[in-house]
Amino acid sequence: MKHWKRKTSKEIQERIDKALGENSSFYDEPIIGMPCSYLDSKVFPHGNPILNNAPFLQTLINNPNHIGCHTVATSEITFSGTQKIERELLNIVACDIFKAEEGEFDGYVPSGGTEANMQAVWIYREFFKKNNGFSLDEIAIVCSSDTHYSIPKASNILSVQIHKVPVDTVTRQMSPSGLSNAFSELRENGVKGIIFVANMMTTMFGSVDKLDVITEALLESKLEFKLHIDGAYGGFFYPFANESNNMNFENEHVNSITVDAHKMAQAPYGTGIFLIRKGFMGYTHSKEASYVKGEDYTLVGSRSGANAVAVWMILSAHGPNGWKEKTHILKHRVDWLCKELDAAKVNYFREANSNIVSLSAACVLPEVARKYQIVPDDHHAPKWYKIIVMEHVEVEDLEMFLADLNIAVLQ
């Protein structure tokens, strides 16, 4: 690991202090030209003792705006210190987790996976239009039927047609023939450019799309394509649970990756990560943002620098070995759960190396689902309920659930 090192609490505090010191201060400097300030002082007083030894809260109250994309262009000098923290974070995630070459990627910290996925579709839509001369009718998003709803949302907002490939109900995988048929149908309808979204752990099942099958079908189709990985859920889990996976930038076909830090990384909500190979952010360059130093390339515009700092702090506190240990503890709990479900003859789906277990709705009474707040695939007509083993889910919680589940099964 070149960039990712474990740090002590003191080292983290000192690094954030340095970053905030490099930012301009709304408390101490005559900044009169910007539509931003520190957080409201009547509610969030600067001298509150709660801020002592609390670097995230200190950053939050200073309220840095990380507008723009700091890997592409110059940025507002007002927040240069915390922008460096964001770049350090992106180096950790891009290079040390997703195996990008240093300096060969761009990215930023968006509001979450939905925005990051939308950013990818927006970039590739503009790429196909400007680089290939394709019309909107000649561009299509392709994904599995298990893909997150942010992709249909991106299709709607960006006016790019979408084609969902069915999955096998047992394996949750798209078949080679299903992919080939989808590409043939699209080609016959005049589509020339494919934005393919592959899943690194789907939201409902934790299933992982097989990239080799997808890329083989894409190459055989002779269609132009860009491959985006939606790792919003799995990005901070799957690379550590399955270190031999090929969903990273060492795979020449992978062009961009979405990760959500407010899921498995347990960062504050409104925190994702978007990564893409160098040379593509420019397709969404908003030159009209001429009053912003470096202008803008992102969907969201203004965004909190405190969120980037929070993720950097979390990863730094654990370090790579601590993160692997955390992942394997959760995976071990899921292994135990699945053995118990097998013994009880409960029908479920679990992707190998996943911490999501989806139970057949026929095995789950509504009162059990309510008690444990397990989530259905459809609140109107559920076929599956999912269990997600997060850090707070102990084996004792699972034992209690299994006891109630077994009573329901016997009934």
Question: What residue spans do the PLM features occupy?
Answer:
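N-terminal entrance/gating region of PLP-dependent enzymes' catalytic architecture
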Residues: M1-E104, W384-Y385
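A residue-level signal for conserved active-site and pocket-lining positions in enzyme catalytic cores
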Residues: L89, A120, S155, F196, ...
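Catalytic cores of large soluble enzymes that bind and process phosphate-bearing ligands
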Residues: W4, T8, P49, T74-I85, ...
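Buried hydrophobic packing segments
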Residues: E86-V93, A116-R125, I151, V311-L315
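Glycine- and acidic
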Residues: C69-I77, E102-Y108, Q161-V167, K192-M200, ...
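Conserved C-terminal alpha-helix-loop-beta "cap" of PLP-dependent enzymes
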Residues: D137, S286-G301, N321-Q411
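Conserved PLP-enzyme active-site core in the AAT-like
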Residues: Y108-H285
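Active-site C-terminal subdomain of aminotransferase-like
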Residues: F240-E243, M247-E351
